[in-house]
Amino acid sequence: MSQFPEVLDNNLLHAENNETAEYIQNDGTNQSEVFMEHPYTPNMHPINMPSIVEGAVHPYNNLIHHNDAIPPAKYASMRQMTEDFWREKKQKMTEISEEDMLNKSKNMSVPMARVKKIMRIDDDVRNFMIASDAPIFMAQAAEFFIEEMTAMGWQYVSEARRRILQKADIASAVQKSDQFDFLIDFLPPKTVPTTSTNGPGHMSEDSFQDPNMHSDFHQRTSNSSVNRSHHN
């Protein structure tokens, strides 16, 4: 029909594949946009995506390959990560100014009241005075302690090519270091993931079970029954 072009806006031109629309602005400049029928998902393959007109601005070009791949571990080993961690912390504490130190002491991540309470748990310490800067030193040491264990957990996750940090990762990473032997009694035992009903790849805290739990239980029960028989 001859009146059909008059119905359309003169500033809008539709492409033949209905995937691009080129806007001709009043000043004569052109701007192209791509309209996607389906939103981007991490598992979308480029061959399944709509065709892209050459020269058009595509907002997802930089996400197709970079968002899917899990980056490799930054450090080759846990020891290298730990050495770099403490080198950075030492340099940071050496270069800190007095003003920053005062501000840091007033805004500690670890509660100062909790630190003072822990420092007075020992009966031998209750009879002595604690200097005002001692809790600040202990609070900063506690922050470094937490940061190091977290960094070790992330290194363990990166080596396993995963994205989510779980408490089992921190426990596994800490158990590899001799300097954390005093935490063995507080760390959960090494566990194996089990299948969850929430979907593939999903692992909750309840899905971790100790493979030796049942054998240890039966061994303890059998030993207790033997001891009762001897007493009888």
Curated annotation (Swiss-Prot):
Keyword Transcription: yes
Annotated tissue distribution: Expressed in certain parts of the gonads with high expression in fertilized oocytes in the uterus and mature oocytes from the distal to the proximal arm of the gonad, but weak expression in the syncytial ovaries and immature oocytes at the beginning of the proximal arm of the gonad. Expressed in the excretory cell, secretory cells in the pharyngeal terminal bulb wall, in the small ganglia surrounding the pharynx and in the neurons running anteriorly to the sensory organs in the head. Not expressed in the intestine, the hypodermis or body wall muscle surrounding the pseudocoelomic space.
Region (Disordered): 191-232
GO molecular function, one term: DNA binding
Keywords for the protein's UniProt record, in alphabetical order: Cytoplasm, DNA-binding, Nucleus, Repressor, Transcription, Transcription regulation
Annotated compartments: Nucleus; Cytoplasm; Perikaryon
Pfam families: CBFD_NFYB_HMF
InterPro entries: CBFA_NFYB_domain, Histone-fold, Transcr_DNA_Rep_Reg
Summary of the knockout phenotype: RNAi-mediated knockdown results in ectopic expression of the homeobox protein egl-5 in the head region. RNAi-mediated knockdown results in ectopic expression of tbx-2 in the gut and seam cells of L4 stage larvae and adults.
GO-annotated biological processes: negative regulation of transcription by RNA polymerase II; regulation of gene expression; regulation of transcription by RNA polymerase II; tissue development
Annotated Polar residues bias: 220-232
GO cellular component: CCAAT-binding factor complex; cytoplasm; nucleus; perikaryon
Oligomer status and interactors: Forms two NF-Y heterotrimeric transcription factor complexes: the nfya-1-NF-Y complex is composed of nfya-1, nfyb-1 and nfyc-1, and the nfya-2-NF-Y complex is composed of nfya-2, nfyb-1 and nfyc-1. Interacts with nfyb-1; the interaction is direct and is required for the interaction with either nfya-1 or nfya-2, and subsequent binding of the complex to the 5'-CCAAT-3' box motif in DNA.
Protein family per UniProt: Belongs to the NFYC/HAP5 subunit family.
Function: Component of sequence-specific heterotrimeric transcription factor (nfya-1-NF-Y and nfya-2-NF-Y) complexes which specifically recognize a 5'-CCAAT-3' box motif found in the promoters of its target genes to regulate their expression and control cellular identity in particular tissue types. In association with the components in the NF-Y complexes, represses the expression of the T-box transcription factor tbx-2 throughout larval development, which most likely restricts its expression to certain tissues.
Stated name of the protein: Nuclear transcription factor Y subunit nfyc-1
